[in-house]
């Protein structure tokens, strides 16, 4: 077969570190021991020239890693990747320098792809026309929205005329007009016989455009071949997956990881086996290092003690200092006891992840009452804790007074800290959203405290009722959602906003609490609690929840 792309037993893994120091230490003392995440594990496939392959799979299955391997952004740990021709990767802001303008990025990317300056000057007008972002082409890319970055990245990549085009979710943030323009361009490439890899969560786009499908499932190729057959199989799987609770999804992931030997492998056990195989030679090597380090430490300690012996007055060991030390110690104990009392009296807990089930009983199999998300705050009863099936549960009170149970893995004590930002910071956020989504974004927080009837009467647009959440009545208008509890507006949520994480931090500064794995951030102002939650790709902020204190 005359293939264009060929993967043979390819494995890509990443070492996990508990803290930055471990990573630094690994630079000097290379060690294969530790935990690894296997993004791709022993995958093989061939793609003939002219095929358009749709790559589907759940988040974390290795789709973006696969696209990076095809584009040459990263190299495999094992196996071979054979690419015939040049490949261009199109992802949101991929390869774009935020400090440079759009024009400067075109020149930079063209030069990196080996295009002459004369040729770059020829294609710049075509790229400007295709991207259609107006005067922003002459502004730094860091000021762009996700959609504008996607437009520029796509325009550059298709006009440098690559042999292989890799599109990683780049069409997910554009409007329908631009998406159609992109699909038309991709069809041109298809007619020219170019090979295209199309990564998307939109099964309709994959089915209508692609000629083959590759289903990645937790680092393995589950199916590869006929587009209709594989998309139908994946769609059936998604329907079942979407009906699962968060706990059931995590159980499925653990089961698949165990089956495919993928993800967080049990490196402790393999590490011990590896150490035994190294034998006495390695043991002697490390023993010499330990002896050397111990000797240096003893020498330093001896020098410090000798200095202290001859210069006693430099050391604060007189009786007065001892007395002061005792007084300070008593004060610290008293203060510590007071802090413990305060903590015991605390009645607020905060959810630290998204999509967490609140159960009727302290059991994962009991009826689900509601779904809680990162930043939701609940009151609890001190004594109402229960341990069942090795999982500790805590009883919480919903907004409507209903009692429910939530696993303590997903909730933690909420404490206000000194990192409280000004209310004006929220105004900066709504002012930015106003420019994109309209004036209602700015006025939305003014409806706090209004009854449902007052809200429906004074709000300029019709409000659509939605199913209740965590004990709140929900009504919505476009990107704005209101939460009503005890007939008062208590929450405003801006949805589908596609804000970059860098822009969020630029507007609000340092967060009070974060979930770095899911890219969720919690802020506290003098009057509000603000929870910024990322989308499923964890690449940008999808919603911002505002709750009045």
From Swiss-Prot:
Binding-site residues, ATP: 57-64
Region of interest (Unknown), residue spans: 244-549
Membrane topology, from the record: Peripheral membrane protein
Keywords (A to Z) from UniProt: ATP-binding, Cell membrane, Membrane, Nucleotide-binding, Translocase, Transport
Enzyme class: translocase
GO terms for MF: ABC-type teichoic acid transporter activity; ATP binding; ATP hydrolysis activity
Keyword Nucleotide-binding in record: yes
SH3b domain: residues covered: 346-415
Annotated ranges, domain ABC transporter: 22-243
The protein's role, per its UniProt record: Part of the ABC transporter complex TagGH involved in teichoic acids export. Responsible for energy coupling to the transport system.
Subunit and interaction comment: The complex is composed of two ATP-binding proteins (TagH) and two transmembrane proteins (TagG).
Protein name listed in UniProt: Teichoic acids export ATP-binding protein TagH
Gene (name only): tagH
């Amino acid at each position: 077969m005359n293939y264009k792309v060929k993967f043979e037993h390819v494995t890509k893994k990443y070492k996990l570190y508990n803290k930055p120091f471990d990573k630094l230490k690994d630079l000097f003392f290379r060690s294969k021991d530790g935990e690894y995440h296997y993004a791709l594990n022993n995958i093989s496939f061939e793609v003939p020239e002219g095929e358009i392959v749709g790559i589907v799979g759940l988040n974390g299955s290795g789709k973006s890693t696969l696209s990076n391997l095809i584009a040459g952004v990263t190299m495999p740990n094992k196996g071979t990747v054979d690419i015939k021709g040049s490949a261009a990767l199109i992802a949101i802001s991929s390869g774009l320098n935020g400090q440079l303008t759009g024009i400067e990025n075109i020149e930079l990317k063209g030069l990196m792809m080996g295009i002459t300056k004369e040729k770059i000057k020829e294609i710049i007008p075509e790229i400007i026309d295709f991207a259609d972002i107006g005067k922003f082409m002459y502004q730094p890319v860091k000021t762009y929205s996700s959609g504008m970055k996607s437009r520029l990245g796509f325009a550059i990549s298709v006009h440098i005329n690559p042999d292989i085009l890799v599109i990683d979710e780049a069409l997910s943030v554009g409007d329908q007009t631009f998406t159609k323009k992109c699909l038309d361009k991709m069809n041109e490439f298809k007619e020219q016989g170019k090979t295209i890899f199309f990564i998307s969560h939109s099964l309709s786009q994959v089915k209508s455009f692609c000629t083959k499908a590759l289903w990645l499932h937790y680092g393995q190729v589950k199916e590869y071949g006929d587009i209709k057959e594989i998309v139908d199989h994946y769609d059936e799987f998604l329907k079942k997956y979407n009906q699962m609770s968060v706990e059931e999804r995590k159980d499925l992931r653990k089961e698949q990881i165990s089956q495919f030997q993928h993800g967080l492998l049990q490196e402790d056990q393999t590490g011990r086996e590896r150490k035994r195989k190294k034998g006495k030679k390695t043991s002697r090597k490390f023993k010499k290092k330990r002896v050397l380090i111990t000797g240096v430490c003893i020498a330093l300690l001896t020098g410090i003690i000798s200095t202290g012996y001859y210069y006693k007055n430099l050391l604060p060991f007189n009786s007065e200092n001892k007395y002061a030390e005792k007084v300070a110690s008593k004060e610290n104990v008293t203060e510590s006891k007071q802090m413990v009392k305060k903590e015991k009296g605390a009645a607020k807990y905060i959810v630290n992840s998204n999509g967490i089930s609140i159960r009727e009983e302290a059991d994962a199999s009991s009826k689900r009452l509601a779904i809680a998300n990162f930043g939701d705050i609940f009151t609890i009863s001190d004594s109402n804790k229960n341990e069942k099936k090795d999982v500790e549960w805590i009883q919480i009170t919903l907004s409507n007074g209903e009692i429910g149970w939530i696993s303590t893995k997903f909730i933690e004590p909420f404490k206000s800290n000194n990192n409280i930002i000004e209310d004006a910071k929220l105004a900066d956020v709504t002012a930015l959203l106003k420019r994109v989504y309209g004036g209602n974004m700015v006025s939305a927080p003014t409806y706090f405290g209004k009854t449902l009837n007052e809200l429906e009467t004074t709000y300029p647009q019709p409000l659509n009722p939605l199913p209740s959440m965590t004990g709140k009545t929900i009504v919505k208008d476009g990107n704005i959602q209101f939460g009503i509890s005890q007939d008062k507006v208590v929450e405003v949520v801006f949805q589908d906003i596609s804000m970059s994480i860098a822009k969020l931090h630029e507007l609000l500064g340092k967060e009070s609490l974060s979930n770095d794995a899911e890219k969720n951030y919690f802020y506290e102002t003098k009057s509000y609690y603000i929870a910024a939650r990322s989308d499923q790709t964890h690449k940008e902020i999808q919603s911002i929840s505002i709750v009045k204190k």
